[in-house]
Amino acid sequence: MPEVIELFVVEHRAPYQFLPNNHQSKSDFIETSCTLACNHPVNCLLRTPMLDVVVLFFLFGLLAGLVRSELKLPPALYDTLSLFLLLAIGLKGGVGLAQQSLQPLLPQLALVILLGMLQTLAGFTVLRLKMSRVDAAATAAHYGSVSVATFAVGVNWLTERGISFESQLSIFLAVMEIPAILVGIVLAQGVSRQTRWRRLAHETFLGKGVTLLLGGMAIGYLAGPDGIAPLKPLFVDLFKGALALFLLEMGLIVARQCQDLRRHGLFLLGFALLMPLASAGLGLMIGQLMGLSLGGLTLLATLAASASYIAVPATMRIAVPQANPGLSLSAVLGVTFPFNIMLGIPLYHSWARHFTE
């Protein structure tokens, strides 16, 4: 009578029973059977993390904020992490640009500027159904612009899976901040003599985010891969840890915005969920015109789907002070940002795969 070997599978109270054939040794059989048991669908589900670890940090911060924990990061640390992430992204993009011709970049920049303008106009058209002109314009500008944190999570998501992407995406990140802001201002109040264009230009083109990104790219481009190599332990190896801490603080911030979102109704909630999906689709079409790779398409869709919560609010406070910042920030931070980093990026990647097949 053949020997019965019992292997326990976690989701069953009773053991599975396997019968080895006459051509397998006991050790070979056990190795094969363990592989089969570990590859059981339920076991795979249990062993495979559904969310990236940095997203779990975000969820931890969100939960801590919702239960009104006293957890908080020092403001100086949050600012330092922002600076670090922007520089790291800029350096990586600059090194990539140093290894390719810059001439094909000009038509691509024109396309991403067009993308930001179209998103802002489309968002304004929808929001105008329920909002005042200035609130609709200010909120639309947030959704026509981009989020560095969402981009950083997208970069990490692709890197973890060994998916390459074009280096010029870092330049797109810097450039896409600008057209949405300018279009949003014009939609809100037109071209007026009262508009403080010099101050707005300084805030738009020389804001912290754009300056750090462009500065990092310039350093990476001039230094090249060999020059940046000594900085790898800081800007490459520590990138994921810095992103995790940054997202922990973002979770705490989002928890506060979730409470504000309840006051603004289902219309804003629906817009905050559907606008990223429509923008991602538009981004994929633009990316296909550029001839981007699978990773590049995924990142451009992620950029298009993201919404600004730093550069645009700061500029709109100057240009359109009568707009209600609570409307846009509660939608961006309470809905769009968590949706993108938890569900959106894998979804946009699956859409991008269909575009490349």
Where does each model-flagged region fall?
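Extreme N-terminal basic, low-complexity initiation segments
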Residues: 2-12
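Compositionally biased, low-complexity intrinsically disordered regions
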Residues: 4-5, 25, 37
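Short hydrophobic targeting helices and cationic amphipathic motifs
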Residues: 17-19, 23-24, 29, 40
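A generic, lipid-embedded transmembrane alpha helix
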Residues: 83-98, 119-120, 145-153
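Membrane-helix boundary/juxtamembrane motif in polytopic membrane proteins
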Residues: 261-270
